[in-house]
Amino acid sequence: FTVFITGASSGIGAALAQEYAQKGAVVGLVGRRREVLEEVRARMNHPQNHEIYAADVTVETELHDAARAFIAKHGAPDVVIAAAGISVGTWTEYYEDLAHIRRVFETNVFAMASTFHPFIAPMKAARKGALVGIASVAGIRGLPGSEAYCASKAAVISYCESLRGELRDSGISVLTISPGYVATPLTAKN
């Protein structure tokens, strides 16, 4: 059983990596900070079985190189989880916040598509696999000062719903997880 997880250095991604390792999966851990990924891997069952890929999910070539390396070693994974995400308080009235809004969408939405893309063809060939997008209940209701995060998670919900329809006859499942508040390093900053 193999699992590829972005955002694996902390929060939901790290927790899922540990949970899957406990159940015997081989896990590919993706995050920007190699040293933090190594700490996560050290806490996992059978750390030598898991792969580390230091990559920024907003840099497609880095992400696709990680995906190709995982596929070359383990084949198409059983599960791909796009858990990388950021949240920055934003107010649209402030010009400088427009760049923050763009960065939130690049990480939370566009990187999810980039995460899933390299796995679709091999999963189709295998006629199995699951693509999992981490959304949020914040994608259902907007919150003042959180418009970038809320809108990005609403986009994730719609994107995954659309992708589910696109892949419905392929053997690939597309799942959306919309957790409520979870105490993570991300939420601690908000």
Where are these regions (language model features)?
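SDR active-site lid
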Residues: R164-N190
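Rossmann-fold cofactor-recognition segment
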Residues: M44-T61
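Catalytic Tyr-X3-Lys loop
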Residues: I86, D97-A113, K128, V132, ...
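Conserved glycine-rich Rossmann-like NAD(P)H-binding loop of the short-chain dehydrogenase/reductase
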Residues: K23-V40
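Conserved glycine-rich cofactor-binding loop
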Residues: S9-S10
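Residue(s) in the substrate-gating loop at a strand-loop-helix junction
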Residues: S136
